[in-house]
């Protein structure tokens, strides 16, 4: 699943992880980057950064909520991504304990939508960005990520059985520097490893 010459979608493209993935993808000569996020101002900042540094790169910027199935299906129908990095999620532990329904809607329903559409539109590879603590969840955010992981795993098994055309992977990212100064891995390094999963599996 080489990136060069391919249409690559990044959900959550305006977040810290998504934005770094976008930066690194831009250096790998994709045919088109499809950037999806519901935060319009940060997404516009990403668009400006790309236009400043990669003037010849074809970029589609789409304001959308991954939990909106109808909107996401229209985006897949129009853009036909070949590779997806699914980074869109709520990640704040304390806030998601206060707004559990939002964690469920975005982290679970949003991931269900992306996984289903990846299979329907025969995307070559989907990489879900999860959280290290999803292994032993203790709060709403971590439980929502774990449920989303299980859905992606089951979708991967089903697609391998039925079509063999879409591979799905999960990458669990922990705390990274400079967000957490006690970490031994930087955000850039974490995203580089994530891209390697997208390319090599």
Model-inferred region functions:
Residues 1-80:
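N-terminal Rossmann/SDR dinucleotide-binding element
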Residues 15, 70, 112, 146, ...:
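Feature representing long, continuous alpha-helical segments
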Residues 45-59, 83, 121, 144-146, ...:
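Short acidic, glycine/proline-enriched helix-loop-strand junctions
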Residues 51-54, 156-163, 201:
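Alpha-helix termini
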Residues 67, 134, 176-178:
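Conserved sequence/active-site signature of Rossmann-fold short-chain dehydrogenase/reductase
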Residues 80, 86, 90-146, 154, ...:
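Conserved Rossmann-fold NAD(P)-dependent oxidoreductase catalytic core, especially the SDR/UDP-sugar
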Residues 125, 152-178, 182:
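Conserved beta-loop-beta element that borders a ligand/cofactor-binding pocket
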Residues 181-201:
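Alpha-helical substrate-binding/gating segment
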């Amino acid at each position: 699943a080489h990136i060069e010459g391919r249409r690559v979608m990044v959900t959550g493209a305006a977040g810290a992880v998504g934005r770094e993935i976008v930066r690194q993808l831009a250096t790998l000569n994709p045919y088109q980057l499809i950037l999806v996020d519901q935060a319009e101002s940060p997404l516009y900042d990403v668009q400006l950064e790309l236009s400043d540094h990669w003037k010849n790169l074809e970029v589609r910027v789409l304001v959308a909520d991954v939990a909106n199935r109808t909107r996401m299906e229209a985006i897949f129908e129009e853009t036909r991504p070949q590779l997806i990095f699914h980074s869109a999620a709520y990640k704040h532990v304390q806030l998601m304990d206060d707004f559990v329904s939002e964690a469920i809607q975005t982290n679970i329903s949003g991931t269900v939508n992306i996984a289903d559409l990846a299979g329907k539109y025969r995307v070559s590879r989907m990489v879900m960005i999860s959280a290290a603590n999803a292994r032993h969840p203790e709060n709403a955010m971590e439980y929502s990520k774990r449920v989303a992981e299980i859905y992606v795993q089951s979708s991967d098994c089903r697609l391998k059985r039925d079509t063999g055309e879409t591979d799905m992977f999960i990458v669990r990212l922990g705390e990274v520097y400079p967000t957490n100064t006690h970490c031994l891995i930087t955000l850039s390094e974490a995203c580089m490893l994530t891209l390697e999963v997208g390319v090599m599996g």
